[in-house]
């Protein structure tokens, strides 16, 4: 091995394997694009995004870490969410939870 060398695993890597998912329609009702990061508590996203919020409590986007999803004005799309991991505590964001889920 050479220092700093990266030896990738053979085959595909499946993200969030085995986690329960929720898929729902999300629409941007605003006049500006809205971007949501991979680990943002989806329940607390911008109010310009219209969807069934209660279904998303404790959930995040099912996308690769460090990436984001952008919703253009007037755009509607299906999104898939997975549960937040760890201690299942949420602090910050829009301060709608501030504790255990």
Curated annotation (Swiss-Prot):
One of its GO terms (cellular component) is urease complex. The keyword Membrane does not apply. It comes from the Bacteria. The keyword Hydrolase applies. InterPro entries: Urease_beta-like, Urease_betasu_sf, Urease_subunit. Its EC number is 3.5.1.5. Belongs to the urease beta subunit family. PANTHER family: UREASE. NCBIfam families: PRK13203.1 (NF009682), urease_beta (TIGR00192). Heterotrimer of UreA (gamma), UreB (beta) and UreC (alpha) subunits. Three heterotrimers associate to form the active enzyme. This is Urease subunit beta. The gene is ureB.
